[in-house]
Each structure stands twice: as structure tokens, then as C-alpha cells.
Amino acid sequence: GDDSHRRRAEATLDFMIEYGWDERYGGWYNAVTRSGEVVDADKDLFMQIYATTGLALYSIATRDERAQRYLRRSRQFMQEHAWDDDNGGYVDVLNRDGSVQHATKDFSPQLAPLSGYLLYLYPATRDSADLHRAERIMDLTLTHMQDDRGWIRERFAKDWTFLPDDSKNSHLNVGHNLEVAWLLLRLYALTGDAAYRTKGLALTDQLLEQAFHAETGAWRSKL
């Protein structure tokens, strides 16, 4: 491939590790300036997961030991501080020291680990733990986040109680439902479990019927 892309990725990794990683408490700061000054030391799971995604894909492409080390540290930080052992799932936001700031549960912290890195790491490493974690998260999604019409909803309390008055739940996010349909079919391809295929195709059919404009070829953003 074009080595300039690898060099840019390496420069980004250098910056992330030098300025973005919290050496005292672990985890990635939400935001730093271009010069590396921390401007938001909280640890939103959205940020943690996509930092981890970058490390995972860089590791797959380069087998870089430093990236692999920070990938392990990132995943360990999230598992130790953000995973809810009682109810399952990741909480939304941590304080700098890893204590829970917001224990609500949103779509992205649950599903982004699958679409971001777990379903790429498993084919690359064949580590069954990655596939088992992906299946566990998908099972939680289907159990707690899918309504009786088959749609995936957005925000929940710590114990997975649906929050009907939350602004994120005022509509259905079409893109997120498309993501789940793809993830279900990807899990079927990796596991051979026909239940994933059945559920993925059912959600796909529902999306095509209610959210796709055949005349324009475009998807609605929400329902």
C-alpha cells in the first residue's frame, strides 16, 4: 500500500499516546488542544471506544507492539471502570479517575465496540474471546434495546429501563438500526448461527419497507 498513509497513522498514534492517554488514571482524555493541552479530562465512552478502534485497526495493519500494548490497556480500562457487572453494558461517561459520572446507557457505547473493532480483531487474530464478547453485547442489545416492533432504541437507565422522555428516544435512528442489521449478518458470517441471519434479515426488510426511498435511493435519517 501507499506508505504515506502508514506514516500519517503513525504520527497520529504518537500524538495520541503522548498527549491523549492519562498516565495517572488510565483511559483517553475527551479532548486536548493541537499542542497537547488537556481541555476536557472526562472520559466519555464514545471517545474511549473510537480511540480503541484506531489502535485496533493500526495494530491489525502494522502488528505494532506499542499499539497492541495501548489497545490492551484501553480495553482493560473500559472493562474495569465502565462495564456494568450487575446489569451488563457500558455506562456513558466516566470522570477522569474512572469513577462513573453518568450511568445511563446509550446506543454507541454498546454497539460501537462491535462495528469499530471486535468484528475486525477476531478475523485477524482468531482470538475467540473477541467473538464471545461481540456475541454477549449483541445478546444484550436484542434483550434490552429492541422494542416489540423490532426497532433498536437509543437511551436507557443503568438497569436498562427505557427512558421515554429522553430526547434521544423521541425518534428511531435509522442509521443505528442499519448498523445493527449489518452487525447481525456479520455475526452470522463469523459464527454460522442462523438466528443472527434471521434477525438481521428481518430488521433489513423492516428498514427497506419503512426507511428507504426507492425513487431517490436515499435513507431517511429517522422515523
Regions picked out by a protein language model, each given a short descriptive name:
Residues 1-223:
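Glycan-recognition and catalytic cores of secretory/periplasmic carbohydrate-active enzymes
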